[in-house]
UniProtKB/Swiss-Prot annotation:
Signal peptide: none annotated. HAMAP family: Ribosomal_bL20 (MF_00382). The lineage of its organism: Bacteria, Pseudomonadati, Pseudomonadota, Betaproteobacteria, Burkholderiales. One of its GO terms (cellular component) is ribonucleoprotein complex. Pfam families: Ribosomal_L20 (PF00453). This is Large ribosomal subunit protein bL20. Keywords: Ribonucleoprotein, Ribosomal protein, RNA-binding, rRNA-binding. The gene is rplT. Gene3D superfamilies: 6.10.160.10, Ribosomal protein L20.
Length: 119
């Protein structure tokens, strides 16, 4: 049985990990064994935070909508309930963007909601 020379594949594997660890501090970017652990942990954080990002942004949108609707005398929950009753199908992302960037349009929506609630 011929002997297996693994120099090329080992070097390629090490290079791949060390390339992924570029920019890390100290031995985390220089030493394969430590870089491998750092890259693995970075991947775990990335996986976790891709899911957390969705929650964080939804919370931000809700906070912005709440702040903007309170300026017009409505709480977030009353405002969202009024939106559903008025059959206005705008998602939280769009509403939050309007609350920050386009205040007159948001005010118009709030007025529609107020008339729906009053009726």
């Amino acid at each position: 049985m011929p002997r297996v020379k693994r120099g090329v594949t080992a070097r390629a594997r090490h290079k791949k990990v060390l390339d992924q660890a570029k920019g890390y501090r100290g031995r985390r970017s220089k030493v394969y064994r430590i870089a491998k652990q750092a890259v693995m942990r970075a991947g775990q954080y990335a996986y976790r935070d891709r899911r957390n990002k969705k929650r964080v942004f939804r919370a931000l949108w809700i906070t912005r909508i709440n702040a903007a609707s309170r300026e017009h005398g409505l709480t977030y929950s009353v405002f969202m309930n009024g939106l559903k009753r008025a059959s206005i199908e705008l998602d939280r992302k769009v509403l939050a963007d309007m609350a920050v960037m386009d205040k007159p349009a948001f005010a118009a929506i709030v007025n529609q909601v107020k008339t729906t609630i009053a009726a």
